[in-house]
Amino acid sequence: MSSCSVVNLAKQLISIPSISPMDLGCQKLISDRLINIGFSVENMNVNQTNNMWAYKGSGTTLAFSGHTDVVPIGNKILWNSPPFSPTVDKGVLFGRGSADMKGALAAMVIAVERFVKKQPDHHGRIAFLITSDEESMAHDGTIKIVSNLIKRKENIDYCIIGEPSSEQKLGDVIKNGRRGSITAYLCIYGVQGHIAYPNFSDNPIHKSISFFCTLISNCWDNGNVFFSPTSVQIYDIESKSSSDNMVPSELTVKFNFRFSNEITSSDIKKKVELLLKHFNLKYSIEWHVSGNPFLTKVGLLSDIVVRSVEELCHISPNLSTSGGTSDGRFIAELGSQIIELGLINKTIHKANECVEIKDLRLLCHLYECIITKIFEK
């Protein structure tokens, strides 16, 4: 197998404009290659989302998880080359999805092809869990595949997610968990009136200031060795006033918690509503939990990934739970050990998204090394 196989496959995937939740043939490209090396492939499509579950072997299962969808290109003028025409310049591959995460998908596939060629009768089961709904709502993607696996009582012992975890150098950061995310959609009610006659109105903005000061200054928890303390950010405020001489009748506010495993989403809801009542506010509130925190403590998978990075990248990776949510929050429902290991994330979602060719090839070797160590007897 030529040394440029991973680059060629990455280019093929990048050339497909699979803006979320569209797949447009990426998974067919991958599944055809997997079928050629003995994989069984199941399509679990939902609405516009393409989902793929592929597997080979039986027993202890190592799954690779990834997504074929990408974010929109943004302002095309900012790109130095067409975003869906993969371009190599001075050892760097440019294109939308190169880092997040078609490069990692290519590395996974080629790594498995190499491993199977060397060990066609390998121990255990290798699997792929791939969706085209990760960058958008994630309602029809990995969560649906996991739901099907749970119904069938299928197990994933170990899972490598190809999210771009690295920061400065390939392998310098690996994710062994993620914080939870819960969003509040709050409406505070007052009484509309003329701004010159405040005694005849009840300003919901003024009424809520003390509440918001307490909300953002409150210590929700102290975190722990794995997680930073729970934090809250207000990200949208809007009143219903359409005139500069009118006190609004209501104020709508959106805020989001990123929370550790020291607190639950239910605890957060209860504490926020106690604060609202403490400040005697008339309100309505809706909540959306995007995901609960998950954590893979030190164990076989994290040990193997760390050793592989040390051997091939010559650095000691940092274990981290920072950043946003990932599809690991769904896979965690299977009780799997989960590690996120992928390319450098400096250019993800930006114009001129790119990866170094040497990193792409090295990631492929890393994945193959991990597979070999997982299944060695």
Swiss-Prot record:
Zn(2+) 1 binds at residues 67, 100, 163. PROSITE patterns: ARGE_DAPE_CPG2_1, ARGE_DAPE_CPG2_2. One of its GO terms (molecular function) is succinyl-diaminopimelate desuccinylase activity. Binds 2 Zn(2+) or Co(2+) ions per subunit. Zn(2+) 2 binds at residues 100, 135, 349. It comes from the Bacteria. Pathway: Amino-acid biosynthesis; L-lysine biosynthesis via DAP pathway; LL-2,6-diaminopimelate from (S)-tetrahydrodipicolinate (succinylase route): step 3/3. One of its GO terms (biological process) is lysine biosynthetic process via diaminopimelate. The active site is at residues 69, 134. It is an enzyme of class 3 (hydrolase). It holds the Pfam family Peptidase_M20. Its EC number is 3.5.1.18. It catalyses: N-succinyl-(2S,6S)-2,6-diaminopimelate + H2O = (2S,6S)-2,6-diaminopimelate + succinate. Its cofactor is Zn(2+); Co(2+). Keywords: Amino-acid biosynthesis, Cobalt, Diaminopimelate biosynthesis, Hydrolase, Lysine biosynthesis, Metal-binding, Zinc. Belongs to the peptidase M20A family. DapE subfamily. Homodimer. NCBIfam families: dapE_proteo (TIGR01246), PRK13009.1 (NF009557). Catalyzes the hydrolysis of N-succinyl-L,L-diaminopimelic acid (SDAP), forming succinate and LL-2,6-diaminopimelate (DAP), an intermediate involved in the bacterial biosynthesis of lysine and meso-diaminopimelic acid, an essential component of bacterial cell walls. HAMAP family: DapE. This is Succinyl-diaminopimelate desuccinylase. It comes from Buchnera aphidicola subsp. Baizongia pistaciae (strain Bp). The gene is dapE.
